[in-house]
Amino acid sequence: MDKFEISSKFKPSDDQEKAVTNIVDSIRSGNKFNVLLGVTGSGKTFTMANVIKRLNMPTLIMTHNKSLAAQLYSEFKGFFPKNHVEYFISYYDYYQPEAYIPRQDLFIEKDSSINEELERLRLSATANLLEFDDVVVVASVSANYGLGNPAEYKGMVLLLSLGMSLNQKELLLKLVDMGYKRNDAYFDRGDFRVNGDVVDIYPAYFNDEAIRLEFFGDELDAMYHFDVLENKRTKDVSKFILYATSQFIVGENRLKQAIKDIELELEDRLAFYEKENRLVEYQRLKQRVEFDLEMLSSTGSTKGVENYARYLTGQKAGETPYSLFDYFEVSGKDYLVIVDESHVSLPQFRGMYAGDRSRKEVLVEYGFRLPSALDNRPLKLDEFIAKKANYLFVSATPNQYEIDLSQGHVYEQILRPTGLLDPRIEVISSDNQVEVLFDRAKAVIARGERVLVTTLTKKMSEELTRYYQELGIKVKYMHSDIDAVERNELIRGLRKGEFDMLVGINLLREGLDLPEVSLVAVLDADKEGFLRSRTSLIQTMGRAARNVNGTVILFANKITNSMKEAIDTTEARRKYQGDYNKKYGITPRSASRNLEDSLKEEDLPNLYNKAKKLEKMPASERAKIVKELRKQMLEAAKNLEFEKAAALRDEIAKLREL
């Protein structure tokens, strides 16, 4: 079995080593559920990596948003450079699910934009899970959504070996069955091309290399990887396993059976509408499904094919849909599931099923979809935790749910290798809180440090930002309408010192790593609620736990139970770390995180901004520009700069239209 190898100049600290040993021993003893309770800045990610190394199991790491998933993917790629670290999030740049609003008689068509690089990474994850053992997949909630049958996907592979007898015509037909398309003019992922006795295949999950097959009659005479852009031979291989272009590709027999089953359900549903005298729904469903059946028969797919997933995967009504978990389980080996920031992730998993079902029930009721579409759904929480996996829930503030689930197997990690103490906490009257905060913030900013302020309302945030700007503070407001790209720009600007204070309502998300922030202010801290609960307050306080001068001010006229619990927990941890530092002579130091590595600048090339010149340019010259842009697009995607890669992709598409 392949072994996980950690690449790091650090070794686990005493506290990390203790947590790793306890977790590994617990899992090996047969305890399915375990909790790592680790404070902010204690190195939970490094602990997770060491658990993976010692257990030596394929691992799925899940978190609740794409930003954290990207951060974790980058970190684990660094920890395991010799192993297969994969990335599995939604491949949509934009996604609007189909929906129907009965009171307005308004049907909203599904609209989406697929990010080809994210799609490639998803395919790479499933392909490598079937081929290797040393696989870590970092995923968002996408891992809970339906995928094709892994057994069907595995059955669609093409096994190639040097010297084998292989008829070229049969090879090309097999490639078409696997979803590959012939394209001799423009060679892209998911394509193949033929030039005499040479067949080039661009696997859908490869980055910038393809595979070349050279035949001598019906014998596979040579096989090697080559760089697509430069057409250079890079690596000879004697064996190669080619996977299909999608997890939803099915064999001919399965497709024929699926079409028959869909036709039977359609007949049954149409009879229901006819009996109920609902002629509009009757006609609507008949027209939509018959069109889909025609497309499935002729092309093997159709728009919204996922709504027929139950039939295409051969499952029964109500069965748990196939998901990424099944690609781990198909080998029959033990695997590990790590749920990062579990106090947020698990409640989100719980809510996914209900939201998806309520939308689809309306579509089914009004004849836009067959009832079987309800089986194309995310996993329920009880299905999620019933998988044949070992679970590790990771959080600074785990909920009672995961603590109960683990039956006491909760392992703390509350010492920071940097010696940093939890922030000092001050409770100050909320009378004149705006003026008091202004004075405190000015002192912090004068030291070259940053300030985060959390308020309860959008109006308060806007007014506070405007007021402080008038008083000369460089401050910005992070509101709920900004997208992930703008959010990262704001965080980058704060870290670089372009402004000194960031104001928001729920901006202090889990995993936000800002070593420059030394003051966190919570206005109206005594207003009990979701944003002022014990968990939220501890998470908010943690944003000041990466700076040696970290301080939290709670503006309140009374101390609520949530405040008291959060303060008591933080002060106990502060004392524990302080005693440890004193015992071992550790001097606290601020955490460090390389700004350029963590937040890369967008720098789109300016090769294509003069349309008139490009139109007059010879096709061969335009092809050179496309080649250069494609190279930059692949490089951007490799560096996880997906917005930049998407912009380059769009420009390439424009150039090809000229």
UniProtKB/Swiss-Prot annotation:
This is UvrABC system protein B. It comes from the Bacteria. One of its GO terms (molecular function) is DNA binding. Residues 623-658 form the UVR domain. The UvrABC repair system catalyzes the recognition and processing of DNA lesions. A damage recognition complex composed of 2 UvrA and 2 UvrB subunits scans DNA for abnormalities. Upon binding of the UvrA(2)B(2) complex to a putative damaged site, the DNA wraps around one UvrB monomer. DNA wrap is dependent on ATP binding by UvrB and probably causes local melting of the DNA helix, facilitating insertion of UvrB beta-hairpin between the DNA strands. Then UvrB probes one DNA strand for the presence of a lesion. Pfam families: Helicase_C (PF00271), ResIII (PF04851), UVR (PF02151), UvrB (PF12344), UvrB_inter (PF17757). The keyword DNA damage applies. The lineage of its organism: Bacteria, Pseudomonadati, Campylobacterota, Epsilonproteobacteria, Campylobacterales. It comes from Campylobacter fetus subsp. fetus (strain 82-40). One of its GO terms (cellular component) is excinuclease repair complex. Keywords: ATP-binding, Cytoplasm, DNA damage, DNA excision, DNA repair, Excision nuclease, Helicase, Hydrolase, Nucleotide-binding, SOS response. Transmembrane segments: none annotated. HAMAP family: UvrB.
